[in-house]
Amino acid sequence: MKTSLSKQPMGYIIEGSLTDGFVMRVAREANIEEVKAGKFVAIAGNQYTFFSMITNLTLQVTHPDILLYPPSDGEHFLKEFLKKNSIYATAQVKPMIVLNKEGRALPVKTVPQHFATVYEATERDVAAIFGCESDRVKKYFNMGTPLDMTTPVCIDLAKLAERSSGVFGKSGTGKTFLTRLLLAGLIKRQAATTLIFDMHNEYGLQARQESNAKFVKGLKSLFPSKVAIFSLDPAATMRRGASPDVVIQLSYEDVCVNDILSLQSELNLHSTAFEAAHLIHNKYKGQWLAALLEQGHDAKVFAEQIGAHPESIAALYRKLKRIEQLPFFVKKLPHRESVIDRLLEYLQKGIHVVIEFGNFTSTFCYLLLANIITRRIHSEYVLKTEKYLGTQKSEDEPEQLMIVIEEAHKFLNPIAASQTIFGTIAREMRKYYVTLLVIDQRPSGIDAEVLSQIGTKIVAQLSDEKDVQAVLMGAPNALTLRAILGSLDTKKQALLIGHAITMPMVIETRTYDEIFYEAMQDPLMARPVQQVIDEIF
């Protein structure tokens, strides 16, 4: 697709370099207050169109003495004279991608000539670069619009699902809203099946908007036949207006020693306590937790039986005894089929699963449940992948699965990432058809190796310098993007970077409202019944 340039020039390139970007002199006719950091512009070269982002603005004068005697408010003639001859503004412009005359996108490897004209990018340019939802081949999804524009910026959902992704931003910037938007796109476009660990009950049935008391639809409300709710607290789910599809109940046998490793920081357990847990497991196998909770009260006697230190047994018993207070944990299940088997059945049918925690919102509960379920699912997907590699039959190829976790730094900090299943999944990338979508306000708390495997990042406003450095680690043009991040509004703006988007882009995020709900409907369901009947017959 060829590009088209808007009629009114924004400015002209006067200097610059490939590594540092270009300097644009803002045109005299342009309104400087409409030239903003993060704005998407096109530089018209002879052979290429350079699509770029404005990263900084500077006021300039032709001679410093002009600043010694600035005109007063009433000196309009002098102001106009200076504006035409002596004062001007420049903008730092960073090229992100070029299009040749055939409309093919290429990396930036050259520079435009002096005085190349800079235009505001057009709607046609945006569609050429970022794709369109109407594309029948690629699974594009509209995430929002460029600053001061109305044309959709799309991400490639198939590429998004191929690698782990992240939604980052400080508290109150709308991370949950961005995630819900993204998940709705994945469900609508059938790009991947999702398993969502919903700690605060914000993705299933409904959720309250952060800015006011209004409620918005959850994924189950938008896609009733495509989303199932598994609940730890069925009473809480029913209070919000629906019965869960499955009530979660787990046995002590479902807990393995490695599941407890991720709780080391949360429980403040010494490494000797985990050594004791392994000793218990060596003797009691799958009944290790039941044995600890039954006999751990007499730590000295129990420690002698298994060859552990009494203080380690006592500490482990004290910390894990709270499991007995969780009503969804039982010593032995009353039936053979486990809830994880049922969950796998739903996922294999392409049904997205939201696990609601209800009133059980402690970090202990969230970490434990997420580890137990994800470990088992990952094992199943490893077996499925190995079978597919052996048979090479298309019907044996697993469907792509994306696991969604909040408070990701608690699963993926430098200690936990090397020991837990979530660190394994993040490092394996798409090897076994399982990826992560991590949501966090503290990306600096996530292990650096894991962060380097995050393919696509959707970043809302961040204020901590460590978090900014972490989220931009490994990104091209990191210095440029850091300036852009600093200019984001608190709400409804985000920076898209990475594997699923053609070039880094600042967007005004799509509004999650009645118009969005209608867009998510099946086209057949959105039309009147009589119209559908008339078309068929």
Language model: regions and residue ranges:
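P-loop NTPase motor domains
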Residues: 201-213, 230-424, 490-498
